[in-house]
Amino acid sequence: MKKIDELRNMSVEELQNELLSLRKDQFNLRMKKASGSLDKTHLITMVRKSVAKVKTILTEKAGK
């Protein structure tokens, strides 16, 4: 997962691509959990928080 400073230095397009990638990861993790093949359930929380970070930075950049 990327640090907040790394995310702030990214452009809006890069952030949107990062968000799309995180959403795909989140979906895949949820499907694995539903099928019972996910051992590391903490990854779901990590990805969810990363999505929130990216969305927050996108909102900050939109306000400027």
UniProtKB/Swiss-Prot annotation:
GO terms for cellular component: cytosolic large ribosomal subunit. GO terms for biological process: translation. Keywords: Ribonucleoprotein, Ribosomal protein. It comes from the Bacteria. InterPro entries: Ribosomal_protein_uL29, Ribosomal_uL29, Ribosomal_uL29_sf. PANTHER family: 60S RIBOSOMAL PROTEIN L35/50S RIBOSOMAL PROTEIN L29, LARGE RIBOSOMAL SUBUNIT PROTEIN UL29C. This is Large ribosomal subunit protein uL29. It comes from Legionella pneumophila subsp. pneumophila (strain Philadelphia 1 / ATCC 33152 / DSM 7513).
